[in-house]
């Protein structure tokens, strides 16, 4: 057995290293297209240059047919006519402008001839003739109710003005010739479509075969077959891109369109000092050791952009799943000569370019960042309410090599008294990388792993990728092929490519039958070795294909219903993620537990199905710094359950770096350590003194704050709000914070955090957004601050720079435990940071952290309020909780109390006392108070409070 295991391990390692040759080369930028190498991007950039060169004489060749517009049930339906030659020949483009109850506007444009399937395909292709129009089917889940009060308030031969939204504050001014739209709020222009005349809808046209020896004009050279990196894209429908310039008037700062490694406030892309010379690209790809400060594409895409200026936010969703590029230019407006010292407002001009599909854009007019997040969440869904364990610490590497190895790691965490919740298995746990199997030599009894972990409430996550090994006597692949559930190549055959197992096929999760089949594979009786505490990691779902064009599959591959891969590429990862999410919900009849599924690839809507991480980063300071910005951007783009590999996937981090990374990651929404197979082991108990102790302290800080984390996720689930909140989101009136991306507030807790992400740095400057009082979280000292200025904090290696803003009440569980499950029925501590007005408030949301019973009212949701005269707890929704029939969990929570209250700040004459009187449910009793006033820290500790966390109570302070 021992010899067999060694040989198997060696062969697996050699196989992995051989496979690694493919993706490792992909880090080189020349393996990924630049705009000039992508025909449709080059054509549209050239189109923009042509328009700019002609300036005021440029006329966009698109106009709305004068007899076509009509408004009915909140929609204007019309036809845009595109003039395509000097003879005046025109192409008809049906357009629908929808005004929604939410105040969001939607514009869709299609191509009539392709709607009617009146085109010819080249190369004998069987691909769909229509433009892809199903992205909304996957991404949009609500918010489409029409605004029946929308009305035309002005119409003539040149334009139509539609008033819509709450109290009619929004207006769309639709210019008929050339076609353009001006979206206004309170009469002021905020977003303009086609202001620069760059709208371009490449209509279908037949290929004209030229006489032998005659070359195609340069404009046509990229219309048809296109070769890159040795792969030829046949493009059977010819050129079909859609592009539009969208201007944000008066907005210098725009955010979003993840996933990229640049700053939060997006850079310009047309060159110049400090700017990019390439557009931001969204084309999900497996990019090893990705480059920092780059617009280069990464693993996921969310085509959502938000613009913000003082007291105003707007945004848009470009709902297109094809390869997409975005150019950004920032301009200064014209100064008013009558205004003394008036600085001209900046504006941002964007140019969106997608290879295929229809034009489908949603416009959000705010006015606040919270409005944008909420409306986007109504459309695409909000973050799934996670299981509580998912917010704990996850320990992973490629790879824990045997069940004994896994059990030993688990025991060592306990020996060192380091909390963790989940241990992960990468691809080597399988039998020769055949998913839904365990290696029969190194994982002979995987159930024993699950049972050992379960004894302390811990979980196991195993990886399942979408590539299925193409080999005989493997039932999963045999079923995939016999049921015809795989992706096909352009000729209609099952597509074959290389990935970790070698020759592989890919499940096509656009196929409803494939999704149903996928569910059967996860049932406990079919996935032997799994149990109730086993969860799933979806990797490589861009999809990643070794040696494929740009490390993925050919664009002319065919999916279910004969849609080309080019049409759906950025959706592919989400459909796989969604399929696994639904599969975990149906593992056992009658088991209604929340799934946990991690994904690498994502799109708008992926937030409904679990967490994401930023892929294969490096163990260096730059990647640590960038991770903070990337995760903040994920949050304001609607996908806040996000993380990055701690402390870098590639490389062996120095002790200082790994320590600072743990301190930073204690504030990642998704907190997982992960490392490459060639790295040294670096579990926190191996770091040595003093680093193990410091990392452990960061982990314990995370666990103590889990009640606040869980409440913050509840908000994200409820209204789409980000977990890590940038300064512009929390303080939209403070102009100094619009570009800050290295500090954040944790939800609405008032915790202001600025992790140390530089070598040999032992102090830092935190920007203060308002004139409220701030306290040091660890010492309770009042920090001398000034609105709009920086304050310097000491940050020795064992300290996380962290303030708590006055006016907040946060919840903690302070007893160290091995896992979050073992803390579930621990008592709570309240930490109150008193505002300068001697007030504070906060909330606690808690449920069983596992099931969907919260949908039936099985939860506790409390509002804590401090006024100058009373501290109280009431139901946050005003429910009469006595009328709720308690289930098992709610009954158990009757024994859970708020036992300690720490009051930071406030006036000594209120808190410098020996005891307070506590009232709850008709009873009154005394609780002792310890008052501290030394070294600039004024705080009171109320001990043995003894109030049930789910009941009303008060402490009067007269």
Range-by-range predicted roles:
Residues 581-596, 601-614, 623-630, 634-644, ...:
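Catalytic core of carbohydrate-active enzymes
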Residues 1-26:
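Fungal secretory targeting signals
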Residues 276, 280-283, 298-301, 515, ...:
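Short, hydrophobic/amphipathic alpha-helical packing segments
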């Amino acid at each position: 057995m021992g010899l067999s295991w060694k040989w198997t391990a060696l062969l697996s390692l050699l196989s992995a290293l051989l496979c690694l040759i493919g993706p490792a080369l992909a880090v080189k930028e020349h393996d990924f297209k630049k705009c000039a190498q992508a025909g449709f991007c080059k054509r549209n950039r050239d189109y923009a240059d042509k328009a700019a060169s002609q300036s005021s004489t440029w006329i966009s060749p698109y106009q709305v047919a004068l007899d076509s517009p009509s408004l009915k049930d909140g929609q204007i339906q019309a036809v845009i006519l595109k003039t395509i030659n000097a003879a005046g020949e025109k192409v008809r483009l049906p357009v629908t402008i929808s005004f929604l109850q939410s105040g969001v506007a939607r514009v869709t444009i299609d191509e009539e001839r392709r709607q009617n399937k009146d085109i010819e395909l080249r190369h004998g292709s069987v691909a769909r003739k229509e433009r892809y129009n199903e992205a909304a089917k996957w991404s949009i889940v609500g918010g489409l109710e029409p605004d029946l009060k929308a009305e035309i308030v002005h119409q003539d031969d040149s334009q139509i003005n539609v008033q819509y939204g709450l109290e009619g504050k929004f207006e769309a001014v639709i210019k008929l010739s050339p076609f353009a739209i001006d979206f206004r709020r309170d009469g002021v222009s905020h977003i303009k479509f086609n202001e620069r005349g760059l709208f371009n809808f490449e209509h279908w046209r037949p290929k004209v075969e030229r006489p032998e020896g005659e070359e195609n004009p340069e404009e046509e050279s990229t219309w048809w077959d296109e070769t890159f990196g040795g792969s030829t894209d046949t493009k059977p429908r010819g050129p079909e891109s859609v592009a539009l310039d969208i201007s944000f008037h008066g907005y210098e700062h725009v955010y979003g369109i993840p996933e990229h490694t640049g700053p939060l406030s997006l850079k310009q892309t047309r060159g110049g000092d400090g700017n990019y010379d390439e557009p931001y690209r969204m084309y999900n790809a497996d990019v090893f050791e990705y480059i920092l400060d780059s617009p280069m594409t990464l693993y996921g895409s969310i085509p959502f952009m938000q613009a913000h200026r003082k007291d105003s936010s707007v945004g848009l969703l470009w709902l297109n799943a094809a390869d997409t590029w975005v150019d950004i230019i920032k301009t200064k407006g014209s100064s008013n000569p009558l205004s003394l010292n008036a600085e001209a407002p900046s504006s941002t001009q964007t140019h969106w370019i997608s290879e295929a599909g229809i034009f489908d854009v949603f416009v959000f007019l705010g006015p606040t960042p919270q409005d944008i997040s909420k409306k986007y969440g109504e459309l695409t869904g909000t973050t799934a309410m996670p299981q509580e364990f998912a917010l704990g610490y996850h320990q992973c590497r490629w790879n824990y090599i045997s069940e004994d190895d896994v059990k030993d790691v688990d025991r060592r965490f306990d020996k060192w008294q380091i909390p963790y919740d989940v241990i992960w298995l990468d691809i080597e746990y399988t039998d020769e990388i055949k998913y839904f199997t365990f290696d029969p030599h190194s994982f002979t009894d995987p159930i024993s792993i699950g049972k050992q972990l379960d004894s302390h409430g811990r979980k196991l996550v195993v990886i399942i990728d979408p590539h299925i090994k193409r080999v005989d006597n493997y039932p999963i692949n045999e079923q995939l092929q016999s049921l015809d559930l795989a992706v096909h190549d352009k000729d209609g055959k099952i597509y074959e490519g290389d990935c970790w197992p070698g020759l592989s096929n890919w499940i096509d999760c656009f196929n409803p039958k494939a999704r149903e089949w996928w569910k059967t594979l996860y049932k406990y009786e079919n996935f032997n070795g799994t149990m109730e505490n086993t969860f799933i990691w979806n990797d490589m779902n861009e999809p990643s294909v070794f040696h494929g064009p740009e490390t993925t599959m050919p664009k002319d591959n065919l999916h279910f219903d004969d849609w080309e891969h080019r049409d759906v590429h950025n959706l592919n990862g989400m459909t796989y993620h969604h399929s696994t999410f639904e599969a975990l919900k149906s593992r056992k009849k009658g088991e209604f537990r929340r799934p946990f599924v991690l994904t690498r690839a994502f799109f708008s809507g992926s937030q409904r199905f679990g967490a994401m991480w930023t892929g294969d980063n490096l163990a260096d300071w730059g990647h640590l710094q960038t991770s903070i910005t990337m995760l903040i951007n994920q949050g304001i783009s609607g996908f806040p359950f996000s993380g990055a590999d701690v402390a870098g996937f590639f490389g062996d981090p120095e002790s200082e770096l790994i320590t600072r990374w743990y301190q930073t990651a204690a504030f990642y929404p998704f907190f997982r350590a992960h490392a490459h197979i060639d790295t040294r082991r670096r579990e926190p108990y191996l770091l040595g003194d003093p680093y193990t102790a410091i990392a452990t302290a960061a982990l314990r800080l995370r666990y103590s704050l889990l009640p606040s984390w869980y409440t913050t996720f509840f908000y994200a689930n409820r209204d789409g709000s980000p977990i890590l909140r940038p300064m512009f989101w929390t303080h939209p009136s403070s102009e100094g914070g619009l570009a800050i991306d290295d500090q954040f507030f944790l939800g609405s807790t008032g915790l202001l955090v600025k992790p140390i992400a530089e070598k040999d740095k032992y102090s830092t400057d935190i920007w203060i957004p308002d004139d409220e009082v701030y306290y040091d979280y660890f010492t309770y000292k009042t920090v001398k601050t000034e609105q709009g200025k920086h304050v310097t904090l000491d940050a020795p290696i064992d300290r996380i720079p962290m303030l708590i803003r006055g006016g907040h009440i946060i919840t903690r569980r302070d007893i160290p435990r091995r896992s979050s499950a073992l803390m579930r029925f621990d008592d709570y501590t309240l930490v109150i940071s008193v505002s300068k007005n001697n007030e504070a408030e906060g909330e606690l949301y808690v449920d069983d952290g596992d099931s969907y019973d919260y949908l039936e009212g099985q939860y506790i949701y409390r509002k804590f309020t401090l006024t100058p005269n009373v501290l109280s707890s009431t139901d946050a929704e005003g429910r009469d909780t006595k009328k709720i029939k308690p289930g098992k969990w709610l009954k158990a929570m009757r024994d859970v109390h708020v036992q300690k209250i720490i009051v930071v700040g406030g006036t000594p004459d209120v808190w410098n006392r020996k005891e307070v009187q506590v009232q709850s449910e008709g009873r009154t009793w005394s609780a002792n108070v310890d008052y501290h006033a030394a070294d600039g820290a004024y705080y009171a500790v109320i001990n043995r409070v003894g109030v049930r966390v789910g009941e009303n109570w008060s402490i009067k302070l007269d």
